[in-house]
Amino acid sequence: RSRAQDGDDIYVSGTIGDGVLGLRALTGLLSGLSAPARDHLIARYRVPEPRLGLGLKLIGLATACIDVSDGLIADLGHICENSKVSARITAASVPVSAPARTALASDPGLFATLLSGGDDYELLFTAPSGARDAVAVAVNEAGIAVARIGAITRAEAEAGVEITDAEALGIDLKTAGFKHFKD
């Protein structure tokens, strides 16, 4: 968690937000989904799929890696704090499942919940931008979808996470449950 460097790419495996949406569905806080969509989200919450194979492929390649248990933004914040860097991500690049997209279509305000909720147990990792081909090979060998969502930047004052398109996506950073730092 402590070797991310300025210029590293930020990646996440699988999809983000299914865990927290599954919990919301179980507790009656999410409605308007088809039974299969609801079942998918609940299953992702109840039985997360750890990405052990991918983690093994990333040994010696990733500069920092953490599972997304506290929420994408919080866990990226842990990498930043431990590595004494900042991060800049594009929320629109964060991979979201089809059931989660359906939920977002009826309530776009849920995007902040997807980014700050937890229990996805996907891998969030950094790797040098010059290692994109090696990352692609590792991802292909592991058979897990991975998305590049941003880059590590030098921390100007305090380590933190910036979401470049938060306002355009209607993400209310004040209520998203995480600290937001700008360069």
Spell out what each predicted region is:
Residues 1-56:
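Short, acidic (Asp/Glu-rich) active-site segment that either coordinates a divalent metal cofactor
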